[in-house]
C-alpha cells in the first residue's frame, strides 16, 4: 500500500487564556490524537503554528495547530500545504461548531464557513472550499449577539465531557477517513449522534 500524506489541522486560539475555551475544540481533538500517538508538538515559525509529524497506519501525517489566532488560520494551513505539496483532498480540519450540540461530531466534505472565522480565512486563502471538516459541536448560546463571548468561554463540566466524547468519536473514524472511506466514516460517526 502506498504511503499517503495528510495534513490534519485543529483550529483554536493560541495561549493559556484560550486553552480551555469552546473555540479550541479543534485543538483538543488534535491534542487527543497526538497523545494517542505519543508525539509532541513543536513550534514551527515557517508554518505559523505548532506541528508534529507521525507515520500512522501507512499514512505520513502532519498535525498542525495554527498560532495565528482564529481569523488568520489560513496562513498556517496554506504554508504547510504548499511547502509539502499536500493535495487539498488530504486536508482535514477539526473545528468547533455552534450549530451542533455538545457531544455531536459530524464529517463534512465541503461547504461554506458557516460564520466560523477560521474556516472563512482558510477558504479565502485557499480560494476553494472543497476540503474535509470534522465539526465538533459546542452548542449555541441562543442569541447571535452572545456568540463571541460564548465561544471564548469555557464549557460547563457536562458540556466538556460531551465534547470529549465527540472528540473520541471523531478519532474512532479517522482510519476510514484516511483510507478514503468517507461514506463508511460518515455513516459510523453520524449514526452515533
From Swiss-Prot:
Underlying gene: pth
Keywords for this protein: Cytoplasm, Hydrolase, RNA-binding, tRNA-binding
Cited PANTHER family: PEPTIDYL-TRNA HYDROLASE (PTHR17224:SF1)
Name this polypeptide is given: Peptidyl-tRNA hydrolase
Catalysed reaction equations from the record: an N-acyl-L-alpha-aminoacyl-tRNA + H2O = an N-acyl-L-amino acid + a tRNA + H(+)
Annotated site residues (Discriminates between blocked and unblocked aminoacyl-tRNA) in this chain: 13
Compartments (UniProt record): Cytoplasm
Organism: Nitrosococcus oceani (strain ATCC 19707 / BCRC 17464 / JCM 30415 / NCIMB 11848 / C-107)
E.C. code: 3.1.1.29
Annotated site residue numbers, Stabilizes the basic form of H active site to accept a proton: 96
Domain of life according to the entry: Bacteria
Subunit and partners: Monomer.
Protein residues bound to tRNA: 18, 69, 71, 117
Pfam families xrefs: Pept_tRNA_hydro
GO BP annotations listed: protein quality control for misfolded or incompletely synthesized proteins; rescue of stalled ribosome
Keyword RNA-binding: yes
